[in-house]
UniProtKB/Swiss-Prot annotation:
Annotated keywords: ATP-binding, Biotin, DNA-binding, Ligase, Nucleotide-binding, Repressor, Transcription, Transcription regulation
Catalytic activity field: biotin + L-lysyl-[protein] + ATP = N(6)-biotinyl-L-lysyl-[protein] + AMP + diphosphate + H(+)
Binding sites annotated in the UniProt record for biotin: 118, 122-124, 189
PANTHER family per record: BIOTIN PROTEIN LIGASE (PTHR12835), BIOTIN--PROTEIN LIGASE (PTHR12835:SF5)
CDD domains assigned: BPL
Tree of life domain: Bacteria
HAMAP family: Bifunct_BirA
GO cellular component: cytoplasm
Similarity section: Belongs to the biotin--protein ligase family.
Name of the protein this chain belongs to: Bifunctional ligase/repressor BirA
GO molecular function: ATP binding; biotin--[biotin carboxyl-carrier protein] ligase activity; DNA binding; transferase activity
InterPro entries: aa-tRNA-synth_II/BPL/LPL (IPR045864), Bifunct_BirA (IPR030855), Biotin_CoA_COase_ligase (IPR004408), Biotin_operon_repress_HTH (IPR004409), BPL_C (IPR003142), BPL_LPL_catalytic (IPR004143), HTH_11 (IPR013196), Transcriptional_repressor_C (IPR008988)
Length: 325
């Protein structure tokens, strides 16, 4: 079934609520035959949708699938660009790897790769990202910004702002940003963001932003080494969270912030990022490849670099593990 027809059919059922819709009404709305309507409904059933059919009444949607799917993500997605070209797989080694391959084959800006499970998910510095089936959001977004190479780190901070805003809209949960790419709830990691670039000489060909979100994990779902430092949206909310809704809200927030960025530059993003960031104005320890620095975090500069006031002066921190306090 074509994605647009599938989306339109699900929307018809959702608008009808508990009421039946006749096959003829669906046929007219979708612009296809009654036989085609039946085939489309069978496709939805294969995806896990429970559709009741009653003679002389028509069809009604009883239950949506519990698992993440392309249809669930597409339905209700209100973006113009981000996520409109969607690649969904139940299992991938890494959404980031697949997104790189797609970008190399001229995938358009806004292409989104989503997996229900990753077998080789990774975060910053090639660290393993625990991404089990059925509980999280594992996705990678392809961008093609016309910006200088040195400005690409700004997109990590833009993504962090969009994730914070999207989570609040989707689940009503307030989160904090820990420089440069971690989203925390009560000091525990909930989201990781990985930004990678494809470039030729001084030209950005594409930027791939990977986002991993712990959505419905419970404490026992985490490996022992993560139980004390990781949490999920569900644990914070005290209820199960709709993963498709989280994706949709984040994509919409990202699209708005990205449009602001391409129109007005980094300043609006910088101000938002600092308003959500932990530790600005307080002491922190930055562990870098060139040593460990301790000092007061002043904020970020116009390139998104962390400014740390130390006894030796202001240090620019480009990449580091941060310890607050």
């Amino acid at each position: 079934m074509r994605s647009t027809l599938r989306k339109d059919l699900i929307e018809l059922f959702s608008q009808a609520g508990n009421e039946f819709i006749s096959g003829q009404k669906i046929s007219d709305a979708l612009g296809c035959s009654r036989t085609a309507v039946w085939k489309h409904i069978e496709e939805l059933r294969k995806e896990g949708y429970e559709v009741e059919a009653v003679r002389r009444k028509g069809y009604r949607l009883i239950k949506k699938p519990g698992k993440l799917s392309e249809s669930e993500i597409r339905f209700g997605l209100k973006t113009e660009v981000m996520g409109q070209h969607l690649i969904y797989h139940d299992v991938l080694s890494s959404t980031q790897k697949t997104a790189h391959e797609l970008a190399n084959n001229n995938a358009p800006e806004g292409t989104l790769v989503v997996a229900d499970k990753q077998t080789a998910g990774r975060g910053r510095m090639s660290r393993v990202w625990h991404s089990q089936e059925g509980n999280g959001v594992w996705m990678s977004l392809i961008l093609r910004p016309d910006i200088p190479l040195q400005k690409t780190p700004q997109l990590t901070l833009l993504a962090a702002v969009a994730v914070v805003q999207g989570i609040e809209e989707a689940a009503g949960i307030q989160t904090d940003i820990k420089w440069p790419n971690d989203i925390l709830i009560n000091g525990k990691k909930t989201v990781g963001i990985l930004t990678e670039m494809q470039a030729e000489e001084d030209r950005v060909r594409s930027v791939i932003i990977g986002i991993g979100i712990n959505v419905n994990q419970q404490p026992n779902d985490f490996p022992d080494e993560l139980k004390d430092i990781a949490t999920s949206l569900s644990q914070a909310a005290g209820e199960k969270i709709d993963r498709a809704g989280v994706i949709q809200h984040i994509l919409l927030c990202f699209e708005k912030r990205y449009r602001d960025y391409m129109t007005h530059g980094f300043t609006p993003i910088k101000l938002l990022w600092e308003s959500y960031a932990l530790g600005i104005g307080t002491n922190m320890r930055a562990r870098t490849l060139n040593g460990t620095f301790y000092g007061k975090a002043l904020g970020i500069d116009d390139e998104g670099v962390l400014l740390l006031e130390t006894n030796e002066g202001i240090k620019k921190i480009y990449s580091a593990d941060i310890e607050l306090g």
